[in-house]
Protein backbone atom coordinates (compact mmCIF):
# COMPACT_ATOMS: atom_id res chain seq x y z
CA UNK A 1 0.00 0.00 0.00
CA UNK A 2 1.09 3.57 -0.58
CA UNK A 3 0.91 4.22 3.15
CA UNK A 4 3.93 1.95 3.54
CA UNK A 5 6.12 4.45 1.72
CA UNK A 6 5.37 7.08 4.35
CA UNK A 7 5.51 4.67 7.26
CA UNK A 8 9.05 3.98 8.59
CA UNK A 9 7.64 1.12 10.62
CA UNK A 10 6.57 -0.58 7.42
CA UNK A 11 10.19 -0.55 6.27
CA UNK A 12 11.11 -2.84 9.13
CA UNK A 13 8.17 -5.04 8.30
CA UNK A 14 9.30 -5.24 4.70
CA UNK A 15 12.69 -6.35 5.94
CA UNK A 16 11.05 -9.38 7.52
CA UNK A 17 8.41 -10.44 5.03
CA UNK A 18 9.88 -8.93 1.89
CA UNK A 19 9.23 -5.64 0.14
CA UNK A 20 6.81 -7.05 -2.42
CA UNK A 21 4.64 -8.38 0.39
CA UNK A 22 4.86 -5.25 2.50
CA UNK A 23 4.25 -2.83 -0.34
CA UNK A 24 1.47 -4.89 -1.87
Curated annotation (Swiss-Prot):
Keywords: Biomineralization, Calcium, Disulfide bond, Extinct organism protein, Gamma-carboxyglutamic acid, Hormone, Metal-binding, Secreted. InterPro entries: GLA-like_dom_SF, GLA_domain, Osteocalcin. It is found in: Secreted. Gamma-carboxyglutamate residues are formed by vitamin K dependent carboxylation by GGCX. These residues are essential for the binding of calcium. Decarboxylation promotes the hormone activity. The keyword Calcium applies. Disulfide bonds join 4-10. One of its GO terms (biological process) is glucose homeostasis. Residues 1-24 form the Gla domain. One of its GO terms (cellular component) is extracellular region. Ca(2+) 2 binds at residues 2, 5. The keyword RNA-binding does not apply. One of its GO terms (molecular function) is hormone activity. PROSITE patterns: GLA_2 (PS50998). Signal peptide: none annotated. It comes from the Eukaryota. The modification 4-carboxyglutamate is found at residues 2, 5. Its main location: secreted. The carboxylated form is one of the main organic components of the bone matrix, which constitutes 1-2% of the total bone protein: it acts as a negative regulator of bone formation and is required to limit bone formation without impairing bone resorption or mineralization. The carboxylated form binds strongly to apatite and calcium. Belongs to the osteocalcin/matrix Gla protein family. PANTHER family: OSTEOCALCIN. This is Osteocalcin. The gene is BGLAP.
Amino acid sequence: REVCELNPDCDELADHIGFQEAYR
